[in-house]
Amino acid sequence: MKNKFVELVEKSQLRTDLPEFNPGDSITVNLWIKEGDKQRIQAFKGFVLRKRNRGLHSAFTVRKMSSGVGVERTFQTHSPLIDSIIVEKRADVRRAKLYYMRGLTGKAARIKEKV
């Protein structure tokens, strides 16, 4: 069991402005990138490969294809570096973790869209 003070601090740091999304959904993650003394927003667009719900330590992995190479990036859900998350499409998948998508390309890698 966690300390009451730790629970209070963690609860104050949880973000409530992010939308609800699930594995398979196509999302765009806009995050702050610092280059030298400048800051800018960079978008990472792909589908959610997995989602880990652990309170303040929650994380999700987004996968995209870039020049024919699969790129995966894991984000901390409640990170202050995330500016916004935009859900592009909802997906209808039967698994919680879509690791099998790593080996698929082309038409085999399509995900059924939820209507």
Curated annotation (Swiss-Prot):
Gene3D superfamilies: 2.30.30.790. InterPro entries: Ribosomal_bL19, Ribosomal_bL19_CS, Ribosomal_bL19_sf, Translation_prot_SH3-like_sf. SUPFAM superfamilies: Translation proteins SH3-like domain (SSF50104). One of its GO terms (cellular component) is cytosolic large ribosomal subunit. Keywords: Ribonucleoprotein, Ribosomal protein. Belongs to the bacterial ribosomal protein bL19 family. It comes from Francisella tularensis subsp. tularensis (strain WY96-3418). The gene is rplS. HAMAP family: Ribosomal_bL19 (MF_00402). This is Large ribosomal subunit protein bL19. GO terms for biological process: translation. NCBIfam families: rplS_bact (TIGR01024).
